[in-house]
Each structure stands twice: as C-alpha cells, then as structure tokens.
Amino acid sequence: MGNILRCFKGDDDGGDHYPYYKPTSRPHYQPPHYHGQPAAPPAPLQQQHLGPHGVTPSTVGVAALAHDLLNFESTSMVPDGLSQHVVSSRKAQVKWYQKLLEAYKNTTPPPKTPANAAQLIARALNMIQRADLEGILEFYNLPIPSLPTASSNYQPSLLPEGVQFVLNTLPVYDKCIGDGDGFTAYVPTTDPRESANVPLEVHELVIARTQARKCRDYQSADALLSSLDEAGYKIISCSDDEVLARKYRIRMRGIDAPELKMPYGKESRTALVKLIGGKSVKIYVYDLDQFGRYVGDIYCNNLFIQEQMLKNGHAWHFKTYDKRPEFARWEREARAANRGLWASGNPEKPWDWRRDQRNARQDAIQVY
C-alpha cells in the first residue's frame, strides 16, 4: 500500500496538471463555493493551509479515497455513505473497491489531484453504469471526466473493405436470438464509439431512475426503464453491476436461414443459440437494411459464425446480396454431406417461402 501511504504525505514535484473535463449528464456542474460570495482563486500550494495528514482542502477527496481504500484492504468494508450516492447493491460496491484497490496499487505515482483520482476511478470502473460512476465521483467530490470522442481510436484503414464500424457486444441473450440469421445485441455505452453519442435525454432518464430507486419509488423506476427502451437503450445486469447499453438489431450478412415456421426453422435457431447464446460477439457492420437492422459479419470466440452456419447446413447462401465465393463453397460442402437442412433432399428456399406468404396475405385481402 505504498501508493496510498504516499498520498497522505503529499509530493512537492509539482508535475501534475488538470486535463480538460466537461460533465455529461450533469451539465451544470461547478466547483463548490459559498452562496453570495464569488469563488476565490486557489492560493499557491505553499500558502494553502495543510489539514490532517498534510492534506490541502483541494485534495481532500483524493485523501478520502486513499483512506477508504486502505480501510477496505484491512476490513473489506466499503464506505457507509456511498449507498446514498449510487443505486447498485452493497455486493456490487465491494467488487468496485476490489478493482479500485488493484488499480491504485498499480498506479505510480499515486494520484495527487482530483483530476488524477477521477481518471483512476473512471478507468478502473469503466464497465459500471454512468449514473453509478458519477455517484462515486460525487461522493468524493471529484470532477466528472469527459467521455472520449467517437473518432479518437477510429482507424478505418484497418477495417475490411466495406465495413463501416465494429460493434463489441455484451453477452447475447438466448431469447434475443430470433432465428438462424438475426438477433438483438446490446453494446455498453462505455464503448468509445457509443459514449460520445448517448443522447442527453438518455442520461437524464438514467439519473431520474437512480433517484427513484433511492426513494424506493420502484413504479416510477420501472416506467423510466420503459422510456429508456423506447429510446433504444437498456440497463443490463452484469456480474452484480448494472450497465447502460444501446440496442442493435442485427442481420447476418450473406446467409438466409429458414423462418421459424418453416421446416428446420427451429433447428437453425437452436444452432445459432449454441454458437453465440450467452457470449459476447464482434460485429463488422456493412450497412443498414430496409427494416432498420444492421447487416454484418459475426465473430464469436474466434469463429466466423456465418461460416459455421453454412458448413453445418443451418442456412442458405444468400447469393442475391452476397457474392463471396467461400460462402458458395461452404454451402456446397454441406449439401454434398447432407448436413442440417440438406438432409431433407429438396428444402424450400426461405426467400421463396416469404414471397408465397406475402402473396397469400394479399389474396386473402382481395377475397375479403
């Protein structure tokens, strides 16, 4: 715990600086000052009064964090007052402090300014929901770091030709897999591409829900969850934490699986569930289709999912929209081996089935 002990002693090197910060869901954040009096400029470091442990008023939050981490290492107890600022359970808070303690020990030199401490907390707890993160920072009276811009790490030259962007999802729920070629995925808003694009309305809904839960107004909290869903976002429980995530409807590029009501439709969906259910996936997005779905190539545990679906006879090659020769080859291999849907000899094409269904509905309307 050398870093934590050094925090109480202070450091005279003067090498620290404040990076630029701007609040997101708290747009009116200002440093505290006495009502009716203008905030006085900070005195030079050597002129500031030193409090207990040699801590200046401007660094009291840094010292409090160090004290709480030292206490947590000895007792495994989180600060009593933290629950008034966050909504997640005590068990989740313990996990946060385990991560914070590890990050603090690995930081050299230890954080000596509020800005440094805020950055450490934001990095160590980058997977918790934004409202909880802001609650912890508020608890220690630390500034709220600005979110990274969407283009800060974006390198389109490294992406395959035609790929617009990449999604790294949370584990895919089995119930979110609709059939053998489509599913709904959620991407955490801590992802750099997502973080800068979360609407202010969504931030406000999350904060309002947090306040409602603190007041035990669970009916209002549930209503706010519904509003989040309508905005295309969801709060997802992840390892005792809650993560704010954006919803994406995904269509797998280049394949067409039997519809659920077709022969082999349920088997095709089951095959996809076995491949990605409960797992995180990487999606290389090419475009948006007419139904608002993101069309892309899917990878999971180093497997190319379209390849697995085609090779095992769980889907057709959708030649109309994808001319990749390897897709045609994988389908031929499955046909030759009578795998999956090809075991029936002459399976109906899904696009033909959908056309017949549309025509049947139109005929029924005309007869009526």
Swiss-Prot record:
<keyword id="KW-0472">Membrane</keyword>
<dbReference type="Pfam" id="PF00565">
    <property type="entry name" value="SNase"/>
</dbReference>
<dbReference type="InterPro" id="IPR035437">
    <property type="entry name" value="SNase_OB-fold_sf"/>
</dbReference>
<feature type="binding site">
    <location>
        <position position="256"/>
    </location>
    <ligand>
        <name>Ca(2+)</name>
    </ligand>
</feature>
<comment type="function">
    <text>Enzyme that catalyzes the hydrolysis of both DNA and RNA at the 5' position of the phosphodiester bond.</text>
</comment>
<feature type="compositionally biased region" description="Low complexity">
    <location>
        <begin position="27"/>
        <end position="38"/>
    </location>
</feature>
<keyword id="KW-1003">Cell membrane</keyword>
<feature type="active site">
    <location>
        <position position="293"/>
    </location>
</feature>
<keyword id="KW-0540">Nuclease</keyword>
<feature type="active site">
    <location>
        <position position="251"/>
    </location>
</feature>
<feature type="region of interest" description="Disordered">
    <location>
        <begin position="16"/>
        <end position="56"/>
    </location>
</feature>
<keyword id="KW-0519">Myristate</keyword>
<comment type="similarity">
    <text>Belongs to the thermonuclease family.</text>
</comment>
<feature type="lipid moiety-binding region" description="S-palmitoyl cysteine">
    <location>
        <position position="7"/>
    </location>
</feature>
<feature type="active site">
    <location>
        <position position="259"/>
    </location>
</feature>
<dbReference type="InterPro" id="IPR016071">
    <property type="entry name" value="Staphylococal_nuclease_OB-fold"/>
</dbReference>
<feature type="binding site">
    <location>
        <position position="181"/>
    </location>
    <ligand>
        <name>Ca(2+)</name>
    </ligand>
</feature>
<keyword id="KW-0106">Calcium</keyword>
<keyword id="KW-0564">Palmitate</keyword>
<protein>
    <recommendedName>
        <fullName>Probable staphylococcal-like nuclease CAN2</fullName>
        <ecNumber>3.1.31.-</ecNumber>
    </recommendedName>
</protein>
<keyword id="KW-0378">Hydrolase</keyword>
<keyword id="KW-0255">Endonuclease</keyword>
<dbReference type="GO" id="GO:0005886">
    <property type="term" value="C:plasma membrane"/>
</dbReference>
<keyword id="KW-0479">Metal-binding</keyword>
<keyword id="KW-0449">Lipoprotein</keyword>
<dbReference type="GO" id="GO:0004519">
    <property type="term" value="F:endonuclease activity"/>
</dbReference>
<feature type="domain" description="TNase-like">
    <location>
        <begin position="168"/>
        <end position="344"/>
    </location>
</feature>
<dbReference type="GO" id="GO:0046872">
    <property type="term" value="F:metal ion binding"/>
</dbReference>
<feature type="lipid moiety-binding region" description="N-myristoyl glycine">
    <location>
        <position position="2"/>
    </location>
</feature>
